[in-house]
Design a protein with these regions (language model features):
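Generic hydrophobic, helix-prone segments enriched in Leu/Val/Ile
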Residues: 1-2, 28-32, 53-54, 71, ...
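Alpha-helical transmembrane segments of polytopic integral membrane proteins
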Residues: 8-9, 13, 41-46, 77, ...
């Protein structure tokens, strides 16, 4: 899947540059990346998946309160992972690395972001990394399947900035899918998080004077703006930040208080502890995937 996706991505991107020169619109960049992935690479991956049988499980509904609680738990997981990714990226490159995904998001129309990042990506990614992977690996152990799914999901992004929060969220989404066997819940959580990061947050940032964000406005000028009542847009950002901080704190509290309520059940073909890593990861296909994605992650960081 990765080879087809990357190869087609390069071909489509080069074709766009040939036609449009260096002035390639952001929506075209997203299309060049997402189109080959969703239309060609992911369907082709089924050729490999179908070789491993799916274990049939009962489906369980998730109550609204349970959904909200787990979604709120995702917020601190996301923030912590994002901090780790930013710190490691900056440390490895002496602060020279840039998050290309953020650049694409900020340079795109919010409707394009909503379609490709907020809607299509969660559906396709949850289908592959939760439904197809966990449904086939859970026979060997629920924790093994969830961790494998989360790691594959994180490496799939090929971005140190995103790796840690994608891994953390992958664990959360994997647990939700394992307990319910219904894709709708993890897809909905994934959509909410992506819509926040690709639509809501950029719209909030765009309301702020860029000089305030980059620190080129003096304190005296900020005071004059406040006295003149011109800080309304800043108030929106402060409100957004306050809400996210509140959700983050609530999520931490829930993660602590609910830590003993996570349920995992013995699988029909549960692997012994000493064989789990060897069986799940020490095979040619997984090794090739790990090597390819790790190399591309490093290349994306230093390129």
């Amino acid at each position: 899947m990765m080879v087809f996706w990357i190869g087609l991505n390069i071909l489509v991107t080069e074709a766009l540059r040939t036609l449009l020169g260096t002035d390639v619109p952001a929506w075209a960049v997203l299309l060049a990346s997402s189109g080959p992935l969703y239309v060609v690479a992911m369907p082709l991956s089924m050729l490999a998946f179908t070789r491993v049988p799916v274990i049939r499980t009962r489906q369980y509904p998730m109550k609204a309160g349970e959904f909200i609680q787990i979604f709120v738990m995702c917020i601190p997981v996301m923030f912590l992972g994002n901090m780790i990714g930013n710190i490691l990226s900056a440390g490895a490159t002496d602060g020279q690395a840039t998050n290309r995904i953020n650049d694409v998001i900020l340079g795109s129309d919010w409707r394009v972001n909503a379609l490709f990042i907020g809607l299509l990506a969660p559906v396709c990614e949850e289908w592959i990394f939760r439904k197809e992977i966990i449904s086939r690996l859970r026979r060997y152990g629920e924790k093994t399947a969830i961790i494998f799914s989360a790691l594959a999901f994180a490496l799939f992004h090929m971005n140190v900035f995103q790796f840690f929060y994608a891994f953390g969220l992958g664990l959360m989404f994997g647990y939700v899918y394992t307990r319910t066997s219904r894709l709708r819940y993890s897809v909905a959580m994934h959509m909410l998080i992506n819509l926040n990061g690709s639509v809501l947050a950029p719209l909030v940032i765009q309301q702020i004077d860029p000089r305030i964000l980059d620190g080129t406005v003096s304190e005296a000028e900020i005071m004059r703006m406040a006295e003149a009542g011109n800080m309304g847009d800043m108030g929106i950002m402060m409100l957004y930040g306050t809400v996210m901080l509140g959700l983050c704190i609530a999520g931490i509290v829930l993660l602590i208080t609910k830590r003993k309520s996570w349920e995992f059940y013995l699988a029909p073909e549960e692997l012994p502890a000493g064989l789990k890593i060897r069986t799940a990861y020490a095979n040619p296909g997984v090794i090739a995937y790990l090597l390819l994605t790790v190399m591309l992650t490093g290349w994306m960081l230093f390129a």
